[in-house]
Amino acid sequence: MRKRLHSFTIYSFEKFEQIFLFMRTNKNYRLPVLISAIILLMTVYAASANPLVGDSLTKEGVKKDMKMVADWQIAHKFTYPEYDWTAGALFAGMAQWAKIAGNETYWDYLKAVGVKLNWGDGPRLYHADDHCIGQMYVELYRKYGKKYMIQPTLNTFTYISEYPSKVDLEFKGKNATDRWSWCDAIFMAPTVWAKIYNVTGDKRYSSFLDHEFKATTRYLYDKDEHLYFRDSNYFTKFEKNGKKVFWGRGNGWVFAGLSTILTELPKDYKNRKMYEKIYLEMAEKLASLQGPDGYWHASLLDPDSYPNPETSASGFYCFGLAWGINNGYLPKEKYLPIVIKGWDALIHSVDPDGKLCWVQPIGGDPQKVTRQMTEIYGVGAFLLAGSEMVKLLDK
């Protein structure tokens, strides 16, 4: 039943997109047509959505979905260390959920993690994965104003800025991860450098951020496809259809990372346009790669080889595109239907008990996904997407 209703929803979204196309060419009808389109969409969504997940495309409906997924994950313990990047991604999304949840439960959950870890990062000094948890620490610092919550991260970043790694960016050898040499790293570390710069104003952190982001982008960004290779090992690899290998979640890490970095940098920041340029190029490309069912897939350029949904990539893209609409970077006429289709797909991947499904396991390239696969970083992506959906629906 859910599959049939979901197909009906996608059909209606296609009609919705036709309405937006009409609006773009008939400016005098924009407001009344937009109102009619929203009413149509709300009606269709209420009829088709899983009643055990979200009852409508409303602010409160999205919050209900987020709560279910967050609560399921908290109730189901994970085996990774709390300082691990997997947990860091979860906590980044959980912190955004905590801001809108309306109670202290989720802040208490995150604070308990910080206390357990003594507010420290992972054990590898230069490894971006071990910095990801700093996103949570900065949000807790903003909430409670206690500098000890970010002091270990400040100490680590100060040392790195003074004694940066000099290795090249080839993903090879035991020190290959001492710099941001794989695209996932753009979510793991640069986001924290941007947040630390935001709360301290110390230009040592922004200078390091700009220098290393520029180096990574020059090395991994494909200027023709407007996508990032996962790392140097994929420069000469190809999919079954002969196209380049661009990993769904890998580029999701980048796109979510860019959205977070741009959130943190001042509007008049001298190098802001460097980040904006890549963000806008990726947004246009990613919008063109969404499947008719609303999902993005494990392989961006060969979805036929990986036809199943992949919700960690889809969550990050939904987050980044909704963020772009909310912050005036992306026109609603083009991108709102894409975001709504993406969110609808995500909630149809949630089991009635709140488990998020269709998450590709840990890896570095496109792999097969089955429905019952779940991972904590996928939940983080879902919560990030939901946080921007709430803002979008609040406008």
Task: Mark where each language-model region is.
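Extended ligand-binding groove/face enriched in aromatic
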Residues: 102, 107-111, 119-235, 240-244, ...
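Bacterial N-terminal signal peptides that target proteins for export
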Residues: 5, 22-35
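Bacterial N-terminal signal peptides
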Residues: 34-44
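Extended ligand-binding clefts on enzyme/binding-domain cores
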Residues: 183-187, 191-300, 307-318, 330-359, ...
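CBM-like carbohydrate-recognition segments
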Residues: 50-88, 97-116, 120-152, 156-159, ...
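Short, Lys/Arg-enriched N-terminal segments with co-localized hydrophobic residues
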Residues: 10-22
